[in-house]
A protein has these predicted regions:
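N-terminal leader/targeting segments and the immediate start of mature chains
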Residues: 1-43, 121-126, 154
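Polar alpha-helical coiled-coil and adjacent low-complexity
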Residues: 5-7, 22, 82-83, 89-101, ...
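One face of beta-strands
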Residues: 23-29, 36-44, 51-55, 73-75, ...
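Hydrophobic lipid-interacting interfaces of membrane-associated proteins
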Residues: 28-34, 60-62, 80-82, 140
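Short, basic/low-complexity N-terminal boundary segments at the transition from targeting/disordered tails
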Residues: 44-53, 104-110
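An acidic-aromatic
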Residues: 50-103
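Gly/Pro-enriched, hydrophobic low-complexity segments
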Residues: 106-156
Length: 156
């Protein structure tokens, strides 16, 4: 007997991806550029599911930069030294002084997890990913600047 139709073999449905927990990280930070040189601490909270992002950059006991927001309500960057307080619907539309530019929270996570980004090189890696990152680029006025990051803490 010849079957009239063939039933495809059962295929397992792809498992629904579990929601990723927010990433919390802390980095030693170094900067060299037209605004001078400095060192400090960069604290990062990224929730890729909502686009929530909080970046705090401290140097010598003062906050140099605060960036916060999410995809739904937009992002805000504050740089007290430069009297900068700016909002934008997307992360890529904001200036990020003292840091490599990223277009989205996902791009920031990719940079921190893999070291991939324009002008970024990884100088040291471990099982979790990049430990030391170096970025070389230009500021908005075309002056060269560099940033060094060294991972101190990573939580997922």
């Amino acid at each position: 007997m010849i079957p009239l139709f063939q039933v495809p073999a059962a295929q397992a449905a792809p498992a629904p991806s579990a929601p990723q927990a927010p990433v919390r990280a802390q980095y030693g930070w170094g900067y060299e550029g037209p605004d001078g040189e400095g060192t400090g601490t960069l604290s990062v909270l990224v929730d890729a599911a909502t686009g929530r992002l909080v970046l705090e950059l401290h140097g010598l006991g003062e906050r140099l930069l605060l960036l916060e927001g999410d995809r739904a309500s937009g992002y805000r960057v504050q740089v007290p030294r430069q009297k900068l307080d700016q909002r934008a619907a997307s992360l890529g539309a904001l200036p990020l002084p003292f840091l490599p530019g990223v277009a989205s929270p996902e791009a920031l996570l990719k940079l921190l997890r893999t070291g991939e980004g324009a002008g970024v090189t990884v100088t040291k890696r471990d099982a979790q990913g990049p430990v030391k990152l170096h970025w070389r680029g230009m500021d908005p006025q075309g002056h060269p600047e560099q940033v060094w990051l060294e991972r101190k803490r990573w939580e997922e």
